[in-house]
Amino acid sequence: FFIKLILFFNFCDIMLYYNNSHEQNEVNQVKKKTLVPLITFLLGICLISLIVYKTDTHEKEQRHITAQLNVANYGERIKNEITNGIEITDTLKQILISEDGEIHQFETIAGNLMSDSIESVQLAPNGVVTDIYPANGNEAGKIDLIHDKDRGKISCYARDNHTIITQGPFKLKQGEYGIAVRNPVYLKDKNGHEYFWGFTIVILRVPDIFSDSISALSNFGYEYKISKTDAPWSDTYKVVYQSDGQINHPVSYTFTIGDENWEFEITPKSGWRNATLLIIIIGMFLTISLLLSVLTRVWLVAKEHKKKFQILARTDSLTNIYNRYGFDEFAEKMIQKNPKAHFVA
């Protein structure tokens, strides 16, 4: 009787321990089903952040490299386009030198030098504009450059420093803008002494003079700005022409014409960040991360259900006590653990 009683209490202790362990197991399983998918998702977010950061850095570097190449290439083209306009003044200068300060048939020569980007060609002996082509509508341009309030200082600088100067932009009568290029001319008298003859002048239309370059850049998706120093002695830049959009953190190219510095700046219209690519990457990897989290939870739930079915196969559904199959399995495990012990069932 005592042996049976001891066995009964031992069995009850075992079942109580089992029930407590089972309840604790269920709590742990609930935590596991929540935490593991959450950790999987958070790790996915960390991985996405790293991928996005690396991609963003690489894209910005590539866009900067491409922009640097474009700004240097088209900056040089703009310089050449402006220089081509300035060459008209050099042509007139050479004629004046060869003809000892005289130009015969000025209108014919100037007409042959004209192009769509040239507003007018002028001669200014002793700094006073006397000849303009085309003459019609440009009568007001016949002024004394040396003593003019707005043009005198920079014209004297060109004369005294033997350098080409550009002034502007200023508004033209047609509503467009122009830049005046003044090229000082020096001749020699009978004694071989050099003296100032005057200026050969060309008025360049803005933006016509560099329309090919800015049109190409606009098609490539860039905002742009062209600036020049306000005067040869100044460090202040004045905008010559710019696109309608905003210029943010531009790359730039500088060049010199005469004694004046020019600056050409560009920036992508869509910005330095490739937002479309980043959205695609975030969307794709976020979807993968969510799917992995869901699949992890599904796997954990399936695993838990499998364990529950295994428990149901071994225990009574009402009492949660081992049934015959479960008891036999449990007894077999106990015997295997303690092969030298004696058990009564």
What name fits each language-model region?
Residues 30-43:
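N-terminal signal-anchor/signal peptide hydrophobic helix marking the start
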Residues 40-101:
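Juxtamembrane extracytoplasmic/periplasmic/luminal helical "stalk" adjacent to the first N-terminal
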Residues 70, 81-146:
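Extracytoplasmic/periplasmic sensory segments of membrane signal-transduction proteins
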Residues 218, 228-289:
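Extracellular/periplasmic juxtamembrane segments that couple receptor/chemosensory ectodomains to their
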Residues 273-312:
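Cytoplasm-proximal transmembrane signaling helix
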Residues 310-329:
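Conserved nucleotide-binding and Mg2+-coordinating catalytic segments in signaling enzymes
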Residues 328-345:
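Active-site-proximal structural segments of metal-dependent nucleotidyl cyclase/transferase enzymes
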